[in-house]
Structures are given as C-alpha cells and as structure tokens.
A protein has these predicted regions:
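Aromatic-lined carbohydrate-binding/catalytic grooves of carbohydrate-active enzymes
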Residues: 153-280, 284-306
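Solvent-exposed beta-strand/loop surfaces of large extracellular or lumenal domains
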Residues: 90-99, 500-516
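Intrinsically disordered, low-complexity Pro/Gly/Ser/Thr-rich segments with frequent PxxP/GP/PP motifs
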Residues: 108-113, 510-525, 529
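Carbohydrate-recognition beta-sandwich/jelly-roll modules
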Residues: 1-187
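Carbohydrate-binding surface patches
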Residues: 58-60, 413, 417-420, 425, ...
C-alpha cells in the first residue's frame, strides 16, 4: 500500500518494490511482453526458458519461475509472482544474484495528494527438489481468488477453423447431424464469428434465417448444448452503440477525442446495462449455455476512463462480472485473448495459447504455450484451442483454413490434445473426414481431465516428456519429438518396468530407464507397470 503525501497531482506509470532474495537463479521460466495496449500476461505472450549468466536479469508479466540455489542449499525450484489481480496488471523481474522487482503498472493513472494505492498480492515461494513448482503457484492463485475449475471437461464442435466468417445455419446443422451419426461423446455445438450483423450489433445476419433462438432450440433437441461467440470489447464504426452512444460510452484520448478504435468504457453505467442485456438475451432468451468471449486484451484502453482510478484491468473485470451476472448459472464462459491470471474466478474456461492455425509450425507454438501453462488448470479449465484432423485432401471451397499437416503430425496433434487435459473442440467439416479420422478422434475418449505434467520443464524449450500420473494401476506418459530431425526421448524409473507403446502396439521391458528413438514430429503414449498383466485394463483409447 502506498499513500501519496506531499505529492503533486501527476500521472504515474508504475509502482515498483525492489529487493534481494536469498537465491542464485540458474534457469528462469517466464513470458515475454507483447503490445496489447496493456502490459498483461495473455494467451499470445511468448514463453521463455533462459539460462542465467552472472548478474543477468529477466523480466516478464505476472510471474517468473526459477531453478537454482537457495542460500547454501542447491537444487531448489521456486517462483515470484502475483496471485491476485484486482487493481493493476503486474510484472516481475529476477536476476541471477537474487535481485528482484515486483511492479504494478499504473498506466499513467492520475495520482492525487492523499490517494491510497493498493497493489495486488505478490508471492515468493521456493522448495527443494520438486520441479512442479508452478502447480503450487496455480494453487495459490486458486486460493487467493476462491477460483476452482468446475467438474468435467467441455467438448464439442466449433465452426471457426473450417468456415471462419463464412459460417451458415446450414453448415451448423449439417455438422450436428454427423456428430449424432458418429455418436461422438461431445456436448457442445459452438457457433463462432460470422453469425452476427457486425461486431457491436449482436443480432443474426441473413445467413441464419431461422434466427439464433430457433437454432439453439434445434441444437438442444438434437441432444447437444448450443454455444456462441461474442466480442464485448470490439465495436465496428457502423454498430448501434458507436452511432448512438459514441460520445458517452467510449474512451477518449489525450486530445479529448473518442479513440478511433472505439474502446468501450464499462465504468459507464449505461454501457454495463447494455452488456447485461446482451448476456441475458443470449443465455436466458435464446438458450445458449456456452459463450466464447473474444477480442479482449487488444481493446482494453490503458486510461482515459470516466471514473477516476479506473483502468484496463478494472474494465476487464467489470465486463466479466457483468456478463457472469447476466447469464444463467449453468452457462459456461470461455475467455479468449484475455489476461491469464485476472480471469481467475470469473470464467469457466481460459484459452492459454495462440490460435492453432493450419501448419505444423503453429502447432509447435501452441504446444509450447499450453504445456508451459499447465498450472492454470488449478484455478480454471484450460483451453488449448481446437483440434483439426483433416488432411490436405479433405477440404472444399468452404474451407477458411487449408491445413497442411500430414498423418504423423495430425496424430501428434491428437496426442498433444490428450496431454493438454483441457477442453476439446473439433473444428473440421465432418462430412469430408474418413473413417480413419473419426477413429483417431475417438482415442481421446474418455477425456483426460487434468494436464499431464512436464518432466523436462526446465530442460527443454517445448516440454517433450509428460506424465499423466497413474490410471487404473498403470502409469501413463506422453513423449513428443517437436524437432525436424530424429531424436531420443527418455523416461527414468526407480526400478524395472514393463512398458506398452500405444501407437507402436508392442510391449517391452525397461530396467530403470527407457529410451525411445523418435522420428521428426512424432509422438507416443507409453504405459508402465510392474507386470504385463496390468495392461489388460488398456483399450483402444489413450486413457485406460
């Protein structure tokens, strides 16, 4: 807490607390800053793994994890990070010699004499020998925000990665019928961007002639739960809110003009009432019980709000609180392009990565982000984005994204989705898939409900050896080769083990260590047990 005394009114950019921790950090795990108007940790923030040289310092939004020495003791793992997100976005820095900074970004807020500035909680934690320190960090966030994931993993089909903005009522109904025919055990049919008149005018366009309420009723009648996409921070110039309330609801720049990006100010009561009615209409009146909330961080103004002391973080939290209060209790909220920590306690699901896109290279980027952010599952259900299993030959003129991944890369994509332990949303045109593709999808059921833990978190840029823990008396591991050349992946055991390889469909024996030579872009699921008879619980699915 800081009180402005003997202080002239001024705009301040940050408030920093500096000190020295009793650590010598050898490796740092953190995220780079990206420009999204506000300095927050969000899904597109690039994860980093850096070996620290003498006196080297690294900085990032929200947290830094480290490996190093604690005083005279070696082999410690720890973190420095914010655990509450009520007042300001925050960042931290840590040097090899233990010097640290914890910074609250005031975003040029006007500070007046007598103002009391309260920052959020920032925590330092270290433990010996256990690399899984970020799970402790996730638990601290969960406790401090009273935020815990709901039971069950949302699964379904999403229109975005095949149809994009060209989605139609017919394409929704067609894919729904195929899901019924294939008896895939998924729940949600999510209509992504392309259904609305324009961003800001959330009514159906001419491609949805029956209307969104009637379409939701058809989806429910077919045995699914209807889902929909909205962007409550993005307003097009021709939208009604801009035309009718442009001077009142939107942030002004330093020149006193409305920002040309039309950045909404939810400190304005009438703007909140508009949002509440939108949420009520979509959830209560139309019947959608899964709402994807998108386009957030890039449209959060730093300052310029009508309410003194209101900032981008407050604007985001106000939006989420308002929307949550408007929808039914059983409505799932998925937040995309949003702050990763500040969402704790507001939404049910959180996108933790970039868009998956259509190439192998984009899958690697997403895998790095998702597998390094497994700790978010302690306070929310993580979303690793959609799964696409289509080959280059399985497209037609409606395709928005032309996928170029080959069969091996698609299988690795499926393995990754299992290891991620988050939501599972399919995003192909299902009528173009063959039996082999559907069989590959089905290996994911029953769904993995918790992220597999990376065993090489501090050693590799993209985690490649992950443990699911024990399922029905069998240890389960996922191995990945993200590289473009053949490489070896190893698992160490405390004693002899029998191993079964899922894709290779063979049983081998390992005496303390198992090494698998893997082709480029390949993956494998490995089961370990004390005797081969334990593998009788295994089926054609990844998890027993």
């Amino acid at each position: 807490m800081f009180t402005a005394k003997d202080f002239k009114t001024r705009r301040c950019n940050f408030l920093s607390i500096d000190g020295v921790l009793p650590v010598r950090a050898k490796t740092a795990i953190f995220n780079d800053y990206i420009y999204t108007r506000v300095l927050d940790l969000e899904m597109q923030s690039p994860p980093r793994n850096a070996a620290l040289m003498k006196d080297q310092k690294e900085s990032g939004p929200q947290y830094i994890a480290f490996q190093g020495d604690f005083g005279e003791k070696r082999g410690y793992y720890g973190y420095l990070g914010f655990t509450t997100f009520n007042r300001f976005f925050g960042g931290v820095s840590l040097s090899e010699n233990g010097e640290f900074s914890a910074c609250a970004y005031l975003d040029f807020e006007e500070i007046r004499p007598g103002d009391v500035i309260r920052t959020d909680n920032c925590c330092f934690y270290a433990q010996y020998g256990n690399k899984d320190v970020l799970s402790i960090y996730g638990k601290h966030i969960a406790k401090d925000n009273r935020a815990y994931p709901k039971a069950g993993v949302p699964s379904g089909w999403c229109s975005w990665y095949y149809y994009g903005g060209k989605v139609t009522q017919e394409s929704i109904l067609e894919n729904m019928e195929i899901l019924k025919r294939e008896k895939l055990p998924v729940k949600y049919i999510q209509i992504d961007a392309g259904w609305q008149v324009r961003n800001g005018d959330w009514e159906e366009n001419s491609k949805f002639p029956m209307g969104m309420k009637a379409l939701a009723a058809d989806i429910k009648e077919a045995g699914f739960i209807p889902g929909i996409w909205i962007a409550p921070f993005h307003f097009e110039k021709e939208s009604k809110p801009v035309k009718e309330h442009g001077n009142d609801w939107f942030v002004r720049n330093d020149d006193g003009e409305v920002d040309p990006s039309y950045l909404i100010d939810y400190s304005v009561k009438e703007a909140r009432e508009w949002l509440f009615e939108l949420g009520r209409k979509i959830s209560v009146e139309w019947g959608y019980r899964y709402i994807k909330v998108d386009l957030i961080s890039g449209y959060l103004a730093i300052n310029g709000y009508k309410k003194h002391g209101f900032n981008g973080l407050n604007n985001f939290c106000t939006m989420m609180r308002t929307l949550r209060s408007a929808v039914t209790e059983d409505t799932m909220l998925l937040s995309c392009t949003s702050p990763l920590g500040a969402l704790a306690g507001y939404a049910d699901c959180l996108r933790v990565s970039d868009d998956i896109f259509e190439k192998w290279s984009s899958l690697k980027i997403v895998a790095k982000q998702v597998l390094r952010r497994y700790f978010t599952a302690e306070y929310i259900r993580l979303d690793p984005d959609c799964l696409m299993v289509r080959l280059p030959s399985q497209h037609d003129s409606e395709a928005f994204r032309f996928c170029t991944r080959n069969e091996r890369e698609i299988r690795t994509f499926v393995t990754f989705m299992s290891a991620a332990g988050g939501t599972l949303m399919l995003s192909d045109k299902l009528s173009l898939l063959d039996r082999k593709a559907f069989d590959l999808i089905k290996v994911l059921f029953p769904l993995n409900e918790k992220p597999a833990k990376p065993l090489d978190f501090f050693e590799r840029d993209i985690p490649s050896v992950l443990s699911y823990g024990e399922h029905k008396g069998v240890e389960v591991y996922a191995l990945f080769n993200w590289e473009d050349v053949q490489e070896v992946r190893e698992i160490n055991f405390k004693g002899p083990k029998y191993l079964k390889l899922f894709y290779a469909n063979k049983i081998v024996r390992a005496d303390g260590k198992f090494a698998l030579e893997m082709s480029a872009h390949d993956s494998e699921i490995v089961y370990a047990a004390n005797d081969a008879e334990s593998f009788e619980v295994l089926t054609t699915s990844i998890l027993p």
